[in-house]
């Protein structure tokens, strides 16, 4: 059977009865209704069976919206922090909606006193063919303070990245990066233990060739004796069939569609990773970015991220 999964950063999903982060940041009733209407239309276009959401403040409202659209189960594992006096939410959460039964929720194991900035979801979902898959939803720590972080390209070696990472950590260039890496490491070791099909739906808050992806996916990040990459997770984009209709004579290959923009520059921050049981079963991959084509910054009544959808044979 085929299933479609997605990751969807909702961009401040907060009902007009509350503010988010500061008292003045609050939707009007009409803007809130417009945002919910846009999300519904987007979900109908995406036509997915399983969706991981980020930036969720108003959990009950999102659950109601998803159930209206035919999702059978909806879960969260954390409540956002609320300043009661002024009715201001101070933190966001992730959420998971599924048209298949969610059979079990487990906590992602952490070591010592470490905790995620936003608790991830780890859910066992039973499909129609009786196969059970494990779906993670995550939203890693952002660089909200715009601290210095090294940027890498597809030509950057792991050795180069780790060398610069050592400098960054030694000099405390970015506490956000340190937190994000610890989150990626924790997910890596939890997912590595899975003996069945597993999917990670995430806003990585880091770029396509970042050291964060190495920490999340690659055992060689941890074992320097390994001479070749040994991946625990695979970017579904890399395994999806490429479609070219009437290619131009000067066609120079595929360029990845950004999922977010910052000062006019496109970045891929939103990913769907799969483990070894699914990497060769990716049938389609699509980025829904029409709203960003109109306005790269997005808007509060839509989203500042594109939505990523992947079709998988299971």
Residue spans of the language-model regions?
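Short glycine/proline-rich turn/loop motifs
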Residues: 20, 164-170
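Metal-dependent phosphoester-hydrolase catalytic domains
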Residues: 107, 115-116, 124-126, 189-199, ...
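N-terminal, active-site-proximal structural segment of metallo-dependent hydrolase catalytic domains
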Residues: 1-72, 78-92, 161, 185, ...
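Short, solvent-exposed beta-strand-terminating loops
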Residues: 2-18, 130-157
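Short, solvent-exposed loop/turn and secondary-structure capping segments
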Residues: 16-19, 63-64, 107-109, 146-148, ...
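Surface-exposed cleft-lining segments at the edges of enzyme active sites
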Residues: 168-178
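Active-site beta-strand/loop signature of hydrolases that rely on acidic residues for catalysis
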Residues: 8-10, 39-63, 123, 135, ...
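Structured beta-strand-rich core segments of catalytic domains in phosphoester-bond hydrolases
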Residues: 50-52, 56-145
